[in-house]
Amino acid sequence: MSIRTIKDCDFSGKRALVRCDFNVPLREGNITDDTRIKAALPTIEYLKSQGARVVLMSHLGRPKGEKNLRYSLMPIARRLSELLGQNVKMLSDCIGDEVVTAVSCMQNGDVVLLENVRFYKEEEENSDAFAMQLSKSGDIFVNDAFGTAHRAHASTSGVASYLPAVGGFLMEREDEFLGKILKNPESPFVSIIGGSKVSSKIAVLESLLPKSNVMVIGGGMAYTFLKVEGYSIGKSLLENEYIDVASSFLKKAKELSVEVILPIDHVVASEFQEYSMPEYVDSVNIPDSKIGMDIGEKTLKKIEGVLSSAKTVIWNGPLGVFEFDSFAKGTAKVAEYVANCPGITVVGGGDSVAAVNKFNLSGKITHVSTGGGASLEYLEGKVLPGIKVLEV
């Protein structure tokens, strides 16, 4: 099902109430990464060019439903002013008479930013009354916050009960690429799923399995699958309660003729510490006293081989403990292989996106998703409230 987008509306002289995801990292009031702010610019610039009066809203952090200036959007207003080359007026609230009055004084092409919507507990409660108050600042609701699309909050889905709702360019792009992965991936389709726990990734594994030709399983969760296959995993992470789940998953993969690639060699350590000495194990089996920390050279060669001919690739989750430099090589190499793959490549989920950015490869990926939990839930096949309200 497709979504309505900003191209479907006439915005001239209209108030566009835009939900963005400006939940950016701050240090002492300074923005340390403005990626999410820059991601919203195409939608904002387009609305300005169409003569809209652009009213932006977002959350920042977890202020727990109370006004807390530590979580004010003021630094975002300053950065937006720099990026847009015009004054972005920061309002002191997100609802109320003063906000409605300030918005009514806007000229076409003006941009204002409402204060943090999570200063009200009613935001996360998806309060109908709060959604109605927010809607008073707009004529058309534009949701461009894919990162919060999995949340049924007042500013992400509730407002759509009171205003016509469309998706911004960022939302449209996320829906297009992640939707293609789920509905119509071109073969050969390779899924690379990493991360530490089977429990947090089993839903996405099961969702992608019937569509995949090859599935690479790495990261900490791979050791539970290796244990099921009868291999020694030493002191590596093991989820005993997911042994049966992993076993039935591997059986289903065989029935569907999906090739599952698990690590065939490892980089290990004696302790799970950043400065532990890395050791190479040229075997599927890990010695009893060692912990698996990363995939080895032979596993990487195998992954490189399947990616060289892939037409579609989805990557979610790191293949090793990439936050420790000594155990980051596997994830770095896979990022490189995905970037060099000739097919459509999609990277989704916070950690794998962080890895792609860390190794400066995002420019070579077809689509790098901006949503962490939202990407994961989309790939699990769940209905996202923030997208559902935009569906045609």
From Swiss-Prot:
<feature type="binding site">
    <location>
        <begin position="349"/>
        <end position="352"/>
    </location>
    <ligand>
        <name>ATP</name>
    </ligand>
</feature>
<keyword id="KW-0547">Nucleotide-binding</keyword>
<dbReference type="InterPro" id="IPR036043">
    <property type="entry name" value="Phosphoglycerate_kinase_sf"/>
</dbReference>
<keyword id="KW-0963">Cytoplasm</keyword>
<feature type="binding site">
    <location>
        <position position="323"/>
    </location>
    <ligand>
        <name>ATP</name>
    </ligand>
</feature>
<feature type="binding site">
    <location>
        <position position="292"/>
    </location>
    <ligand>
        <name>ATP</name>
    </ligand>
</feature>
<keyword id="KW-0418">Kinase</keyword>
<comment type="subunit">
    <text>Monomer.</text>
</comment>
<feature type="binding site">
    <location>
        <position position="201"/>
    </location>
    <ligand>
        <name>ATP</name>
    </ligand>
</feature>
<dbReference type="GO" id="GO:0005524">
    <property type="term" value="F:ATP binding"/>
</dbReference>
<dbReference type="Pfam" id="PF00162">
    <property type="entry name" value="PGK"/>
</dbReference>
<feature type="binding site">
    <location>
        <position position="36"/>
    </location>
    <ligand>
        <name>substrate</name>
    </ligand>
</feature>
<comment type="similarity">
    <text>Belongs to the phosphoglycerate kinase family.</text>
</comment>
<dbReference type="GO" id="GO:0006096">
    <property type="term" value="P:glycolytic process"/>
</dbReference>
<keyword id="KW-0808">Transferase</keyword>
<feature type="binding site">
    <location>
        <position position="151"/>
    </location>
    <ligand>
        <name>substrate</name>
    </ligand>
</feature>
<keyword id="KW-0067">ATP-binding</keyword>
<comment type="pathway">
    <text>Carbohydrate degradation; glycolysis; pyruvate from D-glyceraldehyde 3-phosphate: step 2/5.</text>
</comment>
<dbReference type="InterPro" id="IPR015824">
    <property type="entry name" value="Phosphoglycerate_kinase_N"/>
</dbReference>
<dbReference type="GO" id="GO:0004618">
    <property type="term" value="F:phosphoglycerate kinase activity"/>
</dbReference>
<feature type="binding site">
    <location>
        <begin position="59"/>
        <end position="62"/>
    </location>
    <ligand>
        <name>substrate</name>
    </ligand>
</feature>
<dbReference type="GO" id="GO:0043531">
    <property type="term" value="F:ADP binding"/>
</dbReference>
<feature type="binding site">
    <location>
        <position position="118"/>
    </location>
    <ligand>
        <name>substrate</name>
    </ligand>
</feature>
<dbReference type="GO" id="GO:0005829">
    <property type="term" value="C:cytosol"/>
</dbReference>
<feature type="binding site">
    <location>
        <begin position="21"/>
        <end position="23"/>
    </location>
    <ligand>
        <name>substrate</name>
    </ligand>
</feature>
<dbReference type="GO" id="GO:0006094">
    <property type="term" value="P:gluconeogenesis"/>
</dbReference>
<dbReference type="InterPro" id="IPR001576">
    <property type="entry name" value="Phosphoglycerate_kinase"/>
</dbReference>
<keyword id="KW-0324">Glycolysis</keyword>
<protein>
    <recommendedName>
        <fullName>Phosphoglycerate kinase</fullName>
        <ecNumber>2.7.2.3</ecNumber>
    </recommendedName>
</protein>
